[in-house]
Amino acid sequence: MRPRICGRSSPRAEHSEGKIVFKDEQTQRHINENNYVAFKYVDKDGNKGGFPVNPNGSTDSIAGLTDATGRVLGLMPHPERFVRITQHPHWTRLFAKDKREGDGTTIFTNAVSYAQKNL
């Protein structure tokens, strides 16, 4: 099991063109059995769903995959576009509530922390 580098967050999906589609069931089974799924599109309760939760119709709500080492990550949402709370479409309400960084920052700070401790 790979380390969890990001909890539930809301990195932005900028478009709906990119999505995971497997060439066959054997490939999909291999990806799942080997824990290559790094991120999924889920609602606030952690449940998979259709649009708008899964904005591109990605198979099994998969948003990101890793390689066998966990060091290579392919990710469809764009956390780099949400490192400041002011980049969120509802930033004025969120900022007034808790004055925090954008959710996209979490993936980067947790990845750096993991690398510093383990690599």
Name these PLM-found stretches.
Residues 1-119:
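Amide-donor transfer/coupling interface in amidating biosynthetic enzymes
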